[in-house]
Amino acid sequence: GFLYRHGFIEGFGHLSARLAPDRFMIARHSLGAHAKPEDFVILDLEGRKLEGAGDPPAEAAIHVAVFKARPDVNSVVHYHGMYSTAFTTSEQALRPIHLMGTLFHDGIPVYPDVKLVRDPVRGAELAKVLGPHRAVLMRGHGATLTGPSVEDCIAATFLFEENAQRALLSATLGRPQWIDEQTAAEAGAELIKGRGPFRRVWAMVEAEHEQAAQR
C-alpha cells in the first residue's frame, strides 16, 4: 500500500517478488491499495499461473521477462509515474539531480514502444533495453524498477520518482543543474554501499503500516 498512498501506482501498476529461481508472486489484476497475501498469484517464468485465484495483471509479461533476463533481480515494480513519465515525452533525458537520484547514475534507458507489454516479445524487448540498469522508463507509459529484494525495489521506486519530481521543479526555475557523471557515480556508490536510503524508505513503509493498523 505504500506506493499507492504516495500516488506512484494508483490504479495502474504492480509489484512482484521472486520466490524461487523459476517462479514469482504478483498481485492480481483487480487489486487496489489493500493487497493481502491471499490476493497474489504465483507464476512461472513462462507466465503460466501455478497457484492462486484470479488472473495476474495484463502486463505480467514485464515481470516474467525481467526475472528471466536478470537472475540478480528478486523484485520488480511497474508503475505510471506522474513525474518520471514526463521525461519520456520530451527531449530532456532524466538524470540524477538530487543525491538520492545518484542511485541511478549508471543510466536510465527509455523503452520506445508506448503500447502495453502484454506478450513475451515485448517483454523481452523491454528487458533488453533495461539491460543491467536499476530502472527503465517506458515512453508515454511509465517505468519499471528492479531490486535484489522487495524492500530495495520499493525504496528505489520511491527515490526514482522523487528525483524526477525534483528535476521538474528545478526546470521551472531555469536550466536544471544535473549532477555530473563522475560525482554521481561516486555518490551513488557510497549510498549503495552504506544502504542508508533503502533502510530509511523501508522504515517509512513500516511506520505507515503500523499507523494504518492502529486505525
Task: Locate each region found by the language model.
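Glycine-rich flexible loops
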Residues: G1-R215
